[in-house]
């Protein structure tokens, strides 16, 4: 079963867990599945390999990031401090 119009990919849960939770899951999954900017080459070509591991499809760079997004708020702060 694919998604539904209201909750997209979270439609796989059917009527379980409540609409608010399913909408939240759908929003996180949509952000996770889109292409992200590579920190090495700057191209929008980063895809998630597994939990917290991201790879650029153009330059092949593999790096660790957040579970659902390649850059977390804490990671942004740490990078700013290091620079």
Curated annotation (Swiss-Prot):
Pfam families membership: Ribosomal_L37ae
Cofactor binding, per record: Binds 1 zinc ion per subunit.
UniProt binding sites for Zn(2+): 38, 41, 56, 59
Zinc finger (C4-type) stretch: 38-59
Organism domain of life: Archaea
Family from the record: Belongs to the eukaryotic ribosomal protein eL43 family. Putative zinc-binding subfamily.
Identification of the protein by name: Large ribosomal subunit protein eL43
Source species: Pyrococcus horikoshii (strain ATCC 700860 / DSM 12428 / JCM 9974 / NBRC 100139 / OT-3)
Recorded name of the encoding gene: rpl37ae
């Amino acid at each position: 079963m694919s998604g539904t119009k209201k909750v997209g990919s979270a439609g796989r849960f059917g009527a379980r867990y409540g609409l608010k939770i399913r909408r939240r899951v759908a929003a996180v999954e949509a952000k996770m599945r889109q292409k992200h900017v590579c920190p090495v080459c700057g191209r929008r070509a980063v895809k998630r390999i597994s939990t917290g591991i991201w790879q650029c499809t153009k330059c092949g760079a593999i790096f660790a990031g957040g579970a659902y997004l390649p850059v977390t708020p804490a990671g942004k702060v740490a990078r700013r401090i290091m620079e």
